[in-house]
Amino acid sequence: MSEGIDIKELKRRMDGAISVFKGDIASLRTGRASANILDPVTVEAYGSRMPLNQVANITVPEPRMLSVSVWDKSMVSAVERGIRESNLGLNPIIDGQNLRIPLPELNEERRKSLVKVAHDYAEKSKVAIRHVRRDGMDGLKKAEKDGVIGQDESRAQSERVQKMTDETISEIDRLLGEKEKEIMQV
């Protein structure tokens, strides 16, 4: 096979877009408790802001409850403040060196807005995937124009890039559908 574009590099970049999308939708609060809900929370600790998971252990003891075990007893109130200020709508209850965080039921309006946010994340990921596709296609056109690859090779590689793009976008749609079902499940 002649030179053209690095298909593996394009695949890596498309897989990166899927990974970012998975991370984005994992942070969306559904009806079930998940430690990922607290990923955006930062805590004022030891003179700087730190992610919550660097000062405490987060577990899910019940489907609608999170438990945060703070490692340093002096940090409990700072952790509580960080969770309250995170705009996640959570109200932690201090229980010794632990915090219990009951997750309120999501109302229909909130569920629909979360689905809309998930769709926005999906669209952002699809745009990133299309940019990768465009970079690949531009690389093929340049390689063909420069005489590095022939027209047949260029066409074959562009079909592979298009197939890879379609598969990656289908994966985004599949993940979005799963998340949408999870959010709307009462």
From Swiss-Prot:
- Compartments, as annotated in UniProt: Cytoplasm
What does this protein's UniProt record list under function? Responsible for the release of ribosomes from messenger RNA at the termination of protein biosynthesis. May increase the efficiency of translation by recycling ribosomes from one round of translation to another.
**Primary gene name:** frr
Q: Which residue ranges run through the membrane?
A: none
Would you identify the family this protein belongs to, as annotated?
Belongs to the RRF family.
Q: Name one Pfam family in it.
A: RRF
* Molecular-function GO terms, alphabetical: ribosomal large subunit binding
Q: Which GO terms describe its cellular component?
A: cytosol
* GO term, biological process aspect, one: cytoplasmic translational termination
Q: Which InterPro entries match?
A: Ribosome_recyc_fac (IPR002661), Ribosome_recyc_fac_dom (IPR023584), RRF_sf (IPR036191)
- What is the protein's name according to its record? Ribosome-recycling factor
